């Protein structure tokens, strides 16, 4: 298998899918990354953990519908071109 642009795009899609399917109550809260975790006071810089939680929530919110379309296109391309 060659290292192609399509392989890089497919890798990015797989990572985005992995982030999008993380469930807060079933997975993230068990490792201490649930929604009830505090993010600090006003004026404090949020830590790495708070920023990662914000990234995960943002990806789950914003990328839900586009991921369906991108996954469908990838499936069709794989069916057509192998």
UniProtKB/Swiss-Prot annotation:
Main location: endoplasmic reticulum
Annotated InterPro entries: Yos1
Protein topology in the membrane: Multi-pass membrane protein
Keywords attached to this entry: Endoplasmic reticulum, Membrane, Protein transport, Transmembrane, Transmembrane helix, Transport
Gene Ontology BP, a term: brain development
Bilayer-crossing regions: 2-22, 62-82
Pfam families: Yos1
Protein's UniProt keywords contain Protein biosynthesis: no
Any single Gene Ontology cellular-component annotation: endoplasmic reticulum membrane
Protein's cellular compartments: Endoplasmic reticulum membrane
Superkingdom: Eukaryota
Job description of the protein: Regulator of endoplasmic reticulum secretion that acts as a key determinant of brain size. Required for secretion of extracellular matrix proteins. Required for correct brain development by depositing sufficient extracellular matrix proteins for tissue integrity and the proliferation of neural progenitors. Acts as a regulator of the unfolded protein response (UPR).
Family: Belongs to the YOS1 family.
Protein known as: Immediate early response 3-interacting protein 1
Originating organism: Danio rerio (Zebrafish)
